[in-house]
Amino acid sequence: MAYSARLRKAVGAVRTTLSAVELCDVQAPEFAQHGDHAVASDAPLVLVACSGGRDSMALAAVSHIVCTSMGVRCGVVIVDHGLQEGSEQVAGEAANRCRALGLGPVIVRNATVQARGEGLEAAARQARYNELCAAARESGAIAVLLAHTMDDQAETVLIGLLRSRGVDALAGMPQVFTRSGVTFARPLLTLTRAETTGICEDLGVEYWDDPTNGDAVDGELPNDYPLRSRVRHDLLPAIERFAGFNVTRHFAESARLARMDKEYLDQRSDEVMGEAVTTVDWPASSAAVSTDTPRACAAGDTNDSSHGVGLMISVRRIAREPEAIRLRVIAHALSQAGVNASAAQIAAIDRLVVDWHGQGGVSLPRGYSANRKKHVIRVCQDGAHANR
């Protein structure tokens, strides 16, 4: 069949992404030659995360085309969250459509979604990634492909700006990332949702429309719809009407540029963190050390050995860095210790570094606090600062 321009674009995007995760290096030599070749049963495996929607069905179909041409197996993993009536049927129909396209293995997993304060959307996302990672490890997949499009990227930027600030909010979703030891990639970030819809039409692929997207709703979506659906249905179109141009492409390109900045800042802050921060899990040695050097909070400082992770931040080392790097080092170190601090709390710790005048410590979540003594800032759970 003759490929449409959008289908050729998608094929190129998937092939480029597989190159980015070094999958082209595993291509069987015979597949570089013309002719018909069968994919070996023990060939490397790529999985596509598939919901049955237009984006993921388009990605599944295109990935199968590309992987088959490379001698790589292409399967799918379908996660049933069990949050909607009939979700089992939707998952089953998606599985049958993927089998009809020739994908294999077709893996269907049931997720348990438990919202514990972070909201249902976040809990469902965490449960989904847990199942995707488990499926990848159990099947030995080299990578899992996600079907996020340029439209999803624009929505992510707006959601990021609503929920946070700075370059991280603008950076959107990375094309390639690792989670729990599993490589994930997003080949379709350069394609629009209209293009994935067209690809399904080109290939005769049926798909399911999630009713929570609100596509069939006239007027603004009620507040009980997912935030992403409301951004997609209401906010983006309103901004586009106001701006008078394609803001989806504009936001997606802004995300690409911001991500380059973010990756450099992250790399630099990681280098500084390696020199300025010491992290030790409990229990740790309570041997005395100099207060001028970073060290972990010792188990001997508290009666509870379950206090978690202690941090020691060298003031002399971190003070030499620009504010952008200092704040990232502090934020990354706290995150590594399992402390989800606010921007105001991170800034207060930074003042212990650059504006030290004997002020008290900074209270943090989970019973942690940050206190400066001489040239070291200690981040420990309450009680662990005693006698130090």
From Swiss-Prot:
Reaction it catalyzes: cytidine(34) in tRNA(Ile2) + L-lysine + ATP = lysidine(34) in tRNA(Ile2) + AMP + diphosphate + H(+)
Q: Does the keyword Magnesium apply?
A: no
Q: Does the keyword tRNA processing apply?
A: yes
Entry keyword set: ATP-binding, Cytoplasm, Ligase, Nucleotide-binding, tRNA processing
Biological process, per Gene Ontology: tRNA modification
Record GO terms (molecular function): ATP binding; tRNA(Ile)-lysidine synthase activity
Please provide an example of a Pfam family that matches this protein in its UniProt record.
TilS
The principal localisation class reads: cytoplasm
Intracellular or extracellular location(s): Cytoplasm
Gene Ontology terms: cellular component:
cytoplasm
Per UniProt, ATP binds at S51, G52, G53, R54, D55, S56
Q: In the Enzyme Commission scheme, what number(s) does this protein have?
A: 6.3.4.19
NCBIfam families in UniProt: lysidine_TilS_N (TIGR02432)
Q: Which family does it belong to?
A: Belongs to the tRNA(Ile)-lysidine synthase family.
The record's listing under HAMAP family reads:
tRNA_Ile_lys_synt
Domain remark in the UniProt entry: The N-terminal region contains the highly conserved SGGXDS motif, predicted to be a P-loop motif involved in ATP binding.
Q: What does this protein do?
A: Ligates lysine onto the cytidine present at position 34 of the AUA codon-specific tRNA(Ile) that contains the anticodon CAU, in an ATP-dependent manner. Cytidine is converted to lysidine, thus changing the amino acid specificity of the tRNA from methionine to isoleucine.
Q: What is this protein called?
A: tRNA(Ile)-lysidine synthase
